[in-house]
């Protein structure tokens, strides 16, 4: 996910994307706990995507 693409979206789309990423993160953690996840680095990628998305949301709401 590119930062430029995120900046073009509005707040409602960003909120939906955040919810989707959090669900994906939960699923990956569950797979990791049950030893079904082969590529553990996916968890870190999703975590960083969530942080990136939250930063963009804060920029748009004027909190940064």
From Swiss-Prot:
Annotated GO molecular function terms are: structural constituent of ribosome
Claim: Acetylation is one of the keywords in the record? no
Question: Which Gene3D superfamilies does this one have?
Answer: 1.10.287.310
Give the GO terms filed under biological process for this record.
translation
Q: Which domain of life is it from?
A: Bacteria
For this UniProt record, give its keywords in alphabetical order, as a comma-separated list: Ribonucleoprotein, Ribosomal protein
- Report if keyword Cytoplasm is assigned: no
Q: Name one GO cellular component term.
A: cytosolic large ribosomal subunit
| Database matches in InterPro entries | Ribosomal_protein_uL29, Ribosomal_uL29, Ribosomal_uL29_sf
- CDD domains, per this entry? Ribosomal_L29_HIP
Record family assignment: Belongs to the universal ribosomal protein uL29 family.
Could you identify this protein by its name?
Large ribosomal subunit protein uL29
- The protein's organism comes out as Nitrosomonas europaea (strain ATCC 19718 / CIP 103999 / KCTC 2705 / NBRC 14298)
């Amino acid at each position: 996910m590119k930062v430029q693409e995120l900046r073009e979206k509005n707040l409602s789309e960003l909120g939906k994307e955040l919810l989707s990423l959090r669900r994906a993160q939960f699923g990956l953690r569950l797979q990791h706990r049950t030893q079904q996840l082969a590529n553990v680095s996916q968890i870190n990628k999703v975590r960083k995507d969530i942080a990136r998305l939250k930063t963009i949301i804060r920029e748009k709401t004027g909190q940064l």
